[in-house]
Amino acid sequence: MAEYVFLIYLVDIKYQFRENMYKKLEIIERAILLNPQYIQAFREKLKITQSKLAKESGISQSHLSMLEKGKRPATKLIATAVTLGLLKCFSSNNVENPIIELLDALSLLKFEDTFAEFVSEIIEKGDKGYLRLIENYPVLIISKENLLNEMRSRLEVMDIERIELSRGRIKVIGKHLDNKYVEIFLDCSDIRRLEKKFMKKTGKKVIIQVFPKDEVPPIYSINKDCVIIHCW
């Protein structure tokens, strides 16, 4: 009897695992459907070439290129094919590994998009809580605490627990929707991508600087970990 109960328990665990896995795949599919430009970031996260993904997904490389550039909309069928193609390209036998990698990449991209939306709102409203004029040029100064509070209230794909700022780098620690811990990092290349998103969103030239409080130049008159955004 005990063995029978244990067998049922194992079957239930496997069923829950599969259900959870399918839900994660649906999140990734929906992200590709709404934002096909994310495909490139997903490829880069899993270290997959465009030609390899084209082969495994059954989508031509030229079509894939147009999707990544935002010049073609994605359909449900394409989003599903790309998601399965990404998984097929991954060499590990553990299917959870690439899904977690993709969810981490999605969290990073959503963080960037949400941050860009936040900055755009500051500029549109002329919010003096963040905007300053330094040598007659507008500068946004966002403390770590304000960034944390805003992103917590806006970001849906993960629950943010804390944000750490170091020179030129942002680290975000939190949990996915299934309560698994996630850490995402924005280094120099990610911040460059974030600058481009800001420029596209605001129509302005943008330079982003990240400082721990001990390294903030005196001209900014703030003694906190902060993100400083020059826009003109």
Swiss-Prot record:
<dbReference type="Pfam" id="PF01381">
    <property type="entry name" value="HTH_3"/>
</dbReference>
<keyword id="KW-0238">DNA-binding</keyword>
<dbReference type="InterPro" id="IPR001387">
    <property type="entry name" value="Cro/C1-type_HTH"/>
</dbReference>
<feature type="DNA-binding region" description="H-T-H motif">
    <location>
        <begin position="50"/>
        <end position="69"/>
    </location>
</feature>
<dbReference type="GO" id="GO:0003677">
    <property type="term" value="F:DNA binding"/>
</dbReference>
<dbReference type="InterPro" id="IPR010982">
    <property type="entry name" value="Lambda_DNA-bd_dom_sf"/>
</dbReference>
<keyword id="KW-0804">Transcription</keyword>
<feature type="domain" description="HTH cro/C1-type">
    <location>
        <begin position="39"/>
        <end position="91"/>
    </location>
</feature>
<protein>
    <recommendedName>
        <fullName>Uncharacterized HTH-type transcriptional regulator MJ0529</fullName>
    </recommendedName>
</protein>
<keyword id="KW-0805">Transcription regulation</keyword>
